[in-house]
């Protein structure tokens, strides 16, 4: 129990998880309500894709004890901690009677997570419409993007009976998604929700002494060159003292906000509509640890997302 309390204090689970899930569930309800109203008219097939499905189990995983994962040298977390990082799979599947999605894709790199998730969701009547993939999220996202691109081409043929719409949730444990992967989703008939680890992981790599820790990782994450990232997080001052004039570098005060701003700006280069105020998720010490962002080619989708976020944030 002591470990569980510590995990919540450090941000791996707790109230913020419920806030994220409540927000997303409300969006899924609104999404399905709208899509169901026009599904038959426009011959839509709906796909739900969860790139980090996990098992959604907060219970202690005894078999995970002693197995740790180091996140960029910032300390180890157990696989139990990762289970606290609850996914949205069961909440989405529970909405299947609305009706829900035509197809469900649940991805997780840990085989035991996928196995437990499959057992948990067996009680719901989603059967052959569901794929459980023990795989890397970056790889599967690129596969999804390729499928959506091919579907867009098929859509131009007069004899094609339907086309696909996708709702994609990416809530990785850390900086697992490369920006090049996100780029593949541009131009697709897809709504994206992504969890950005602002204060939990990324901020730890923006050091106070003016250096970026693991700069290559930051480049992959933001999709920006190291020089540009450095310029966003550090300010150069010309200082005059007894030794003459010299330059000092200081870190911006609102670095966690800047992380979120940069990521949203980058999403804006791929999607015409992005929530301008993401859902800011905080730990028990009221420190922002994640930003939950929605991006889409559909203005109404992001408008609804922003309304839900604003209500949750207030």
Q: What residues fall within each predicted segment?
A:
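Class I S-adenosyl-L-methionine-dependent methyltransferase catalytic core
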Residues: 1-314
């Amino acid at each position: 129990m002591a470990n569980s309390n510590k995990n919540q204090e450090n941000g791996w689970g707790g109230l913020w998880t419920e806030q994220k899930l409540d927000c997303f569930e409300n969006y899924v309800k609104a999404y399905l309500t709208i899509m169901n109203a026009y599904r038959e008219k426009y011959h839509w097939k709906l796909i739900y894709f969860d790139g980090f499905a996990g098992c959604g189990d907060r219970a202690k995983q005894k078999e995970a004890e002693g197995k740790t994962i180091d996140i960029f040298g910032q300390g180890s977390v157990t696989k139990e901690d990762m289970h606290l990082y609850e996914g949205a799979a069961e909440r989405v599947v529970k909405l299947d009677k609305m009706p829900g999605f035509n197809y469900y894709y649940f991805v997780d790199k840990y085989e035991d997570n996928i196995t437990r998730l499959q057992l948990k969701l067996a009680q719901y009547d989603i059967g052959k419409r569901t794929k459980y993939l023990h795989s890397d999220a970056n790889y599967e996202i690129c596969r999804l993007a390729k499928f959506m691109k091919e579907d867009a081409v098929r859509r131009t043929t007069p004899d094609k009976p339907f086309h696909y719409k996708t709702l994609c949730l990416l809530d990785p444990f850390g900086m697992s998604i490369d920006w090049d992967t996100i780029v593949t989703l541009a131009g697709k008939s897809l709504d994206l929700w992504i969890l950005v680890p602002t204060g939990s992981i990324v901020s730890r790599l923006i050091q106070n002494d003016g250096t970026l820790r693991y700069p290559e990782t930051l480049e992959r994450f933001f999709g920006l060159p190291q020089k540009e990232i450095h310029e966003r997080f550090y300010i150069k001052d010309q200082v005059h003292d007894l030794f003459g004039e010299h330059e000092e570098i200081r870190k911006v005060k609102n670095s966690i906000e800047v992380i979120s701003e940069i990521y949203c700006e980058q999403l804006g280069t791929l999607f015409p509509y992005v929530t301008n105020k993401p859902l800011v998720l905080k730990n028990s010490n009221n420190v922002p640890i994640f930003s939950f962002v929605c991006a889409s080619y559909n203005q109404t989708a992001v408008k609804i997302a922003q309304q839900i976020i604003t209500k949750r944030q207030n």
